[in-house]
């Protein structure tokens, strides 16, 4: 039964998968890369974004140490929802699409940070935040 509320839909799907004895593919497995590729291809098609990836390429570029290269923590799966540590595919130059050479695996949190600002803005906010924390700790 489809729901218009994404949270209700996600909960319904999670319960169905548990009831049916199915689970999300483990990070780093062939099924994980195939599933990721399939979802990205559908997203690209629906949003008219260029796409030329395959599951083998996604596996080849996945960090061998299973860690986010930007924030350096180990990738993890959420229980039915994406979490900050979930592996996500980032388009380095968004308007180039999901094409070989323009994507990288990073955590959901790193992807959110990078998609919302320019590199200079990310550094500026980071420096400001660091100053705020240092002042608070000194007080």
PLM features per residue range, with description:
Residues 106-107:
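Zinc-coordinating Cys/His ligand positions in small cysteine/histidine-rich zinc-finger domains
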């Amino acid at each position: 039964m489809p729901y218009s509320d994404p949270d209700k839909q996600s909960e319904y799907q999670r319960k169905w998968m548990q009831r049916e004895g199915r689970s999300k593919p483990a990070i780093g497995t062939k099924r994980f890369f195939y599933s990721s590729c399939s979802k990205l291809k559908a997203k690209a098609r629906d949003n008219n974004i260029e796409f030329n990836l395959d599951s083998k390429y996604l596996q080849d570029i996945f960090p061998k140490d299973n860690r986010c290269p930007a924030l350096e923590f180990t990738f993890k799966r959420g229980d039915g929802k994406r979490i900050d540590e979930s592996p996500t595919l980032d388009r380095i130059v968004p308007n180039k699409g999901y094409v070989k050479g323009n994507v990288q695996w990073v955590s959901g949190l790193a992807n959110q940070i990078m998609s919302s600002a320019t590199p200079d803005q990310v550094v500026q906010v980071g420096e400001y935040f660091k100053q705020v924390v240092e002042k608070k700790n000194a007080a």
